[in-house]
């Protein structure tokens, strides 16, 4: 009806209704009878309305735009007005500055013109003479100040030569500008990061002083003197580097020169100057300025200007001044001018004798004035001033006068230096105010500007070297360090007391300031390390050597006093050792005697451990709680001593020491570098450690270090930190409960974790307690997890940091596995220097070898490098240095299992991700050790010699046997895994498996059956995959050695895998990464980890294939964890997938676990993740195997390019299908391309885990392998055909993979997936391998 009605309506007015927009009224009326016309009308209405609105909006917009334009125009005009005013003000300012002189001159000129009109030419000349003389004096003063600042030709030119000198001054002034205004620190440098002013803190004052000095030299000498004094402070602080050397001599010369200047100008000038200097010394700048203004302002200007700069050319300028005085007297007939000339020059001499100048008014004037006063009398005091803590704050001066600083320190003329400091503080309240400030971030600036400059000029010559080093490294903590040094300077007469005090204050400061204390410690360590703070990282390696050597020397002998005088840092560190060592050496004397009884290696390792681990943990532990750690170490050590762990302690300590030596080599360099870099890494590690550890930068290491120290100490490996000996032996009186209490004291997080881990290690806690401790250990483990997670997170935070952290974690994982304390040390140390860790390790081993002659670093290094190529690599060699030194002890490697296993749970807690691969080996080792612990400590004692080897191997995640060329490829850990699987089932089972593993030729963990023979030393040559029989090291057959190495490493791997397997079994409980933490804790608990692992492993060796695959799962887990960091993901997958595929049981589970485990692996081997991420794509299998074996696969990869393909791959292959792979691959194993053939092979080997004889294998698997896998051999030989095309690794990997998938039909799918990954990896791998990626 509506339509009809509208239709009826439409005909009369249809067009208008449709076409025209309706009005509101029409719409209302039609609302009752709505029609299409109404719709059309409404539409028209709305359209019109919208158009109107849009048009209005556009109009408004135009109006607004117009307003905006007008506003902008007004704004521009307003700014133009502002600019006009600014220009006017600037013009007036400039004019005023010019007119200050010219106004008077203009007035004088007007008067002179009037006078000229009235007077004759002669009168005019007479009037002009004084003006000319004044102008000449001003010019000479300016030139002198410029020359003195620059010290170039100032001394060479006489007053007659002032014109030439002025030209020279013009040339020299820019230098003065930079002297006065030091350039900012290099962007990103430690000082740059540490100091808010970025080295330009004094710029504002210096700029004003530079401008006002030069502008106001003529204008207002008061400003000029003040600014010049500021400039002198700055220039001296800047020149201190150059001047400290010259100033030391020049100050003595100044004393002499002052004597000469005094003799020449004593009567009037020196007395006047000394009087003015005396007045000036006690007085502030205003007083000095007033005195100078009252006195001869121009003379004093000259004096101040010349004095600020003459320091360098004091004698030259004095010589120039004396003739200049005569000539100036001649030039300036007025006696006042001659007096001024004499007083400026004579006063210059006097100023130099006084050490005064406008620039030196308070800083140098006081220094030099006091020098004339005190230098004749206080010449020793001025020399003693250098010991004063603050003068040493200048880095340049410290660098220049390093030796001077130390003699001064040893001279400990702190009382005179304090006197002078007090004198300077008293004369200049502002300075004294600066005296506290110099300790601040800008100590250099403050000290430079203030008395500290005076002190610097005086003291900086000698002491600055010492404290300058420290403060150059840690200027941020200069207050603390300055105070420390003040205490030193004060207490240096009692050097040992000051050392103890410093160590206490340092411990307090470090305890109070986790990060800052660590930074301090780092800076102190840096002080030890490099003369140059920036170079501290590089020099830390060397200077740390020197410092470490003195430490090693001084620590064995009364360490605190000896190193105190040598290095400020060493003073503090030695005082750390002194107080720590005093504290702990007193306690460590007990442990030392005990540990001496244990192994002779421990003392040497102590030296390295004390040198490095003590340095690290002196920093860390002192930072954390010096006494707490001592008590914790004691209690822990007592637990171990009370337990049958004393042998383990000796071994663990040896391992920790050996590995700490190695870790110290690695880590200590890194700890030193790290300490130096911890500042640098404060950006990366600070955030990571602070964020992740929850502690300071060092909080992570502190947390982990407390846990490490507690754990490590509980594990005898702990003692090395402060008193590896002491702590491991102090324990005799302490109860496990005390350990728990001490550990809890050390750090809430680490304490619980440590207690739990220690109790777990010692079996003190039941499985439930251990599991409970596991969570608490998760706490400490969370630091390990944090380490693992940090390793992962650090991937984000700092690629190198994580890699370095990985490397650190690897080395620390290895070291922590041997001694968690080392792991934590390593974690704490390498993390900072992770980027340069490899180089540092390379150098650090040398350095630490030099530093730690006691450690078998040198013997170890030579032997290890030759024998550890695959496992040890360069760094492995370093770690293998101890391996090699423990190579002597290596025959005891079976003990290594037990020791490693005990230690590994703890270290695995910290380093689960890291340890998953290494930890797997070392877990098994560790668990085996509990078996041996249950069986008795004797194995550990017998392992004591191999404890270092175990440490190094564990730390390297390298079984010496695993280092064997074929053994390195054990990754699947087929045979050892089964034995290890038995280990996880129960400690008794483990001990049984320990026995069974040694029974197996390859089952012997570190070639245990051969003890040392099968161990890494044979394979340690980085360049040779084939083990060079180093005499006693290896079984005659490499097959047996492979088997022993594989089983030992795979036993370890299985133990680590056991952690992952426990993860796999308990994987629902925790994510892969997380549960390994529990697993390490459980591993430390052993019962819980065994319980968790027991279900899969209770079969023990029976589970060889399934357990291997199971372990392969856990390993792939480890590998998967490594995946994050590793292009090695491919490798962990290839490796994990190989092991997973090889153990078909893991077919479904391995990917997730392998990913988790791989992460752990890569975490365990940060270097691998570093280098492997780049290299692992190509090295997928090798780096992984290398990861298991080598914490430093990068170097290994480089060295292993030729040897590692055999060494690593063969080492890792032998246990898994890799024996046959080793055959095919060994044929090409020397070839870079062999790695990819090996990658598929490990998968096959997993299946045909029996040794596949590699006819071409360097490791002579021909005999054992032929018996094991002829079929896989042929298959792998077929793959070897593709292996010939190493570049086409995909062909090899595909052929090998297809074949591998056949033997691994169990996990054929997983194998195919992972092999496809391998193919991809191998596609990339061959190029890298061809280029020597491995």
From Swiss-Prot:
Presence of the UniProt keyword Membrane in the record: yes
One Gene Ontology cellular component: plasma membrane
Region (Interaction with VPS35): 348-1334
Domain notes: The LFa (leucine-phenylalanine-acidic) motif bind directly to VPS35 of retromer CSC; adjacent motifs can act cooperatively to bind multiple CSCs, although there is significant variability in the affinities of different motifs for retromer.
Segments for region (Required for interaction with F-actin-capping protein subunit alpha (CAPZA1 or CAPZA2 or CAPZA3)): 1024-1042
Residue spans of biased composition, Polar residues class: 513-530, 584-594, 601-611, 908-919
Chain ranges for the short sequence motif LFa 15 as given in the UniProt record: 1255-1263
Biased composition (Basic and acidic residues): 289-324, 625-639, 818-830, 894-906, 1203-1225
Species name: Mus musculus
Motif (LFa 17) on chain: 1323-1331
The gene coding this protein: Washc2
Biased composition (Low complexity): 201-213, 541-561, 1297-1311
Span(s) of short sequence motif LFa 6: 658-670
Motif stretch (LFa 9): 852-858
Quaternary structure note: Component of the WASH core complex also described as WASH regulatory complex (SHRC) composed of WASHC1, WASHC2, WASHC3, WASHC4 and WASHC5; in the complex interacts (via N-terminus) directly with WASHC1. The WASH core complex associates with the F-actin-capping protein dimer (formed by CAPZA1, CAPZA2 or CAPZA3 and CAPZB) in a transient or substoichiometric manner which was initially described as WASH complex. Interacts with VPS35; mediates the association with the retromer CSC complex. Interacts with FKBP15.
Name of this chain's protein: WASH complex subunit 2
Motif (LFa 4): 531-542
Motif window: LFa 14: 1227-1233
Biased composition (Acidic residues): 219-232, 249-274, 442-454, 800-811
Sequence motif LFa 11, residues: 1124-1131
One GO term (biological process): endosomal transport
Motif position, LFa 8: 835-843
Positions of region (Sufficient for interaction with WASHC3, WASHC4 and WASHC5): 1-219
